[in-house]
Amino acid sequence: MSNEYFDPKLKIFSLNSNRELAEEIAKEVGIELGKSSVTHFSDGEIQINIEESIRGCHVYVIQSTSNPVNQNLMELLIMIDALKRASAATINIVMPYYGYARQDRKARSREPITAKLVANLIETAGATRMITLDMHAPQIQGFFDIPIDHLNAVRLLSDYFSERHLGDDLVVVSPDHGGVTRARKMADRLKAPIAIIDKRRPRPNVAEVMNIVGNVEGKVCIIIDDIIDTAGTITLAAKALREAGATKVYACCSHPVLSGPAMKRIEDSPIEKLVVTNSIALPEEKWIDKMEQLSVAALLGEAIVRVHENASVSSLFE
């Protein structure tokens, strides 16, 4: 891609969550970003103005619902409503990071299922399709009645480590049981075995014990996760792997939320390098020397073109 794309009916708009990524995606597709503005009334209400005609157009809106989650979500919902009322033919949401995905079920009594609520809001506002990346819970796709293209960053992350020639003694590690499928996909691409961190609390008020299922002694370990938030799990896992004899520990994730003590924990951990994507825009204060960021612009740009041309996107899932 990156050549000029000749279809005036294809429009890409960006809101405020990750404009840099949106500009990269538009460049990959070969068109300019659509003209729109987001302003606020004095009481904080969001006002959106679409500054060009989109009547009969197939519109793609790029917006992650990352921090500030509620602000970014409301921007998106208001934008969808504006596009619907301006007679867009289709309204396609490109959401690299789907916020509220961790609230996908009732873990305790009287809890909401917020991932479903967000899906309802997006659909009710008028979205006709969604393209997203590595949802925390893949079953959230079932909360929608519109088509969802659920991409993953495993190929991008795997290629990074493959190009670094880390040797034959690689092991891909899942930091919990829920991430085993993701770890297995990376392991298949790197032709490496997997290991699993099994966290157990032997009895109440006793610290969790990290048991490692698999052989990591003398190995170079790559921990893969979908989200790193406070970095507690991944840094404790890295420490446990080193104590079990791993020679080096790398870590990677699709969504670097990185809140609270995350940066200090990563800096102080035995992790050699943390590789993340740009699904979430990172401010300067969240950058450290041992971090590297990969762009998902080519992946999302290719998905947009294929969807627009009614071509298959299934090869992008592999």
Swiss-Prot record:
Instruction: Describe, as the record does, how this protein assembles with itself and its partners.
Output: Homohexamer.
Q: Specify which residues bind Mg(2+) 2 according to the UniProt entry for this protein.
A: D176
Top-rank taxon, per record: Bacteria
Taxonomy of origin reads: Bacteria, Bacillati, Bacillota, Bacilli, Bacillales
What this protein is called in its record is Ribose-phosphate pyrophosphokinase 1
Its GO biological process terms? Answer: 5-phosphoribose 1-diphosphate biosynthetic process; purine nucleotide biosynthetic process; ribonucleoside monophosphate biosynthetic process
Q: What does this protein do?
A: Involved in the biosynthesis of the central metabolite phospho-alpha-D-ribosyl-1-pyrophosphate (PRPP) via the transfer of pyrophosphoryl group from ATP to 1-hydroxyl of ribose-5-phosphate (Rib-5-P).
Top enzyme category? transferase
For this protein, the record's PROSITE patterns field holds:
PRPP_SYNTHASE
Tell me its cofactors: Mg(2+)
Q: Gene3D superfamilies under this entry?
A: 3.40.50.2020
Family classification: Belongs to the ribose-phosphate pyrophosphokinase family. Class I subfamily.
Which pathway, metabolic or otherwise, does it act in? Metabolic intermediate biosynthesis; 5-phospho-alpha-D-ribose 1-diphosphate biosynthesis; 5-phospho-alpha-D-ribose 1-diphosphate from D-ribose 5-phosphate (route I): step 1/1
Location within or outside the cell: Cytoplasm
| Classification via InterPro entries | PRib_PP_synth_CS, Pribosyltran_N, PRibTrfase_dom, PRTase-like, Rib-P_diPkinase, Rib-P_diPkinase_bac
SUPFAM superfamilies xrefs: PRTase-like
